[in-house]
Amino acid sequence: MGSTLPTTYKRAFFEKQDATLTLEEVQLIEPQRGEILVKVEACGVCHSDHFAQMNLMGGGFPRVPGHEVVGRVAAVGDGETYWKIGDRTGAGWHGGHDGTCGACKKGLFQMCDNEQVNGITRDGGYAEYVLIRSEAAVRIPDHVNAAKYAPMLCAGVTVFNSIRQMNIPVGETVVIQGLGGLGHLALQYANRFGYRVVALSRGAQKEEFARKLGAHVYIDTSKEDPVAALQKLGGAALIVSTAPSPELINPLIEGLGVLGKLLILSIVGGIEVHTGLLVSERRIAIHRTNSIVRSLLTNSKVGKGKSIWSWPSGHATDSEEAIAFAELQGIDCLVEEFPLEKCNEAFGRSSSTTADRERVFLADFTGLTTTAAMMDGSVRFRAVITME
């Protein structure tokens, strides 16, 4: 490696399952063939970083989390021809692919049978330096703010890519459930895509904020029935679930119109789906026998063709397109910055459930005052760890 690089660097890692993050200084490792070494400028904190803490994907320990990385190439592995020292680059959830499986042959690299995941199965960006697979690295414009664009590599590309993959015609009604890290970006992307955007959340205090982000309609679920409200609008062509609320899944299905799609992007855990709601034109009676949910259809009419979808983030090109679209359309990711030394505080933001820990300052965004923007409830934005 070049003489300008340090011999050691700081990183935050999980030593064992369910542990807090530990800071340490370790030897800098040279990139191998197919890898680039990146000096980290910023790394977003995502709820999925808990997968590393709990070893849910078998990545093992010790593990450095973080898959929303922006930085610059500091060194390249042997034979590297695409990336050069000094290039602005980044890393998202997708950390590498084999290029030979069925998904890869279709260009769906983030669905690779042998996919690597940054910060989960390989070390991530809670560090001053990180090794990234060359084929999974994302080209980042030189002029963009690292902290604001780091979350685009997961939250941003997830909502951008999944919504566009649903192939909803322009002008249709698209509902965004939840106003957190994913939801506040989904509102903006859906608005710029040309949809009639409906924000679905609890609390009247969030309406102004939702409309500033691009919602044309706001439904306060604490005051009105979301199903009735959505059906009054003609039913949704697409509902994007960005908040983990299992009890809302079936009501959301009822809020869909003909051929409507429910896109689940949040981690909701185990849910029971009333399948009759997907095919029946009326409410159905649900009976439970031996823990098996059985749907009794109340009529024999042809169903409405409703469906439930998911979409796994995106690969490097998807991320580059999400960033380019965000720049073109003025989409803004709202973040709260932390130094690496406060990594545990930043990590706590991704799982906090109390109002105090979910408050962030948004005084400079769209004219909202600090008081109005420090909203109680389930509004949650992106914590970002920044390096000196």
Curated annotation (Swiss-Prot):
Substrate binds at residue 67. One of its GO terms (cellular component) is cytosol. Its cofactor is Zn(2+). Zn(2+) 1 binds at residues 46, 67-68. It catalyses: neopatulin + NADPH + H(+) = (E)-ascladiol + NADP(+). One of its GO terms (molecular function) is alcohol dehydrogenase (NAD+) activity. Pathway: Mycotoxin biosynthesis; patulin biosynthesis. It comes from the Eukaryota. Zn(2+) 2 binds at residues 101, 104, 112. It is found in: Cytoplasm, Cytosol. Keywords: Cytoplasm, Metal-binding, NAD, NADP, Oxidoreductase, Zinc. Binds 2 Zn(2+) ions per subunit. Alcohol dehydrogenase; part of the gene cluster that mediates the biosynthesis of patulin, an acetate-derived tetraketide mycotoxin produced by several fungal species that shows antimicrobial properties against several bacteria. PatD catalyzes the conversion of neopatulin into E-ascladiol. The pathway begins with the synthesis of 6-methylsalicylic acid by the polyketide synthase (PKS) patK via condensation of acetate and malonate units. The 6-methylsalicylic acid decarboxylase patG then catalyzes the decarboxylation of 6-methylsalicylic acid to yield m-cresol (also known as 3-methylphenol). Belongs to the zinc-containing alcohol dehydrogenase family. This is Alcohol dehydrogenase patD. It comes from Aspergillus clavatus (strain ATCC 1007 / CBS 513.65 / DSM 816 / NCTC 3887 / NRRL 1 / QM 1276 / 107).
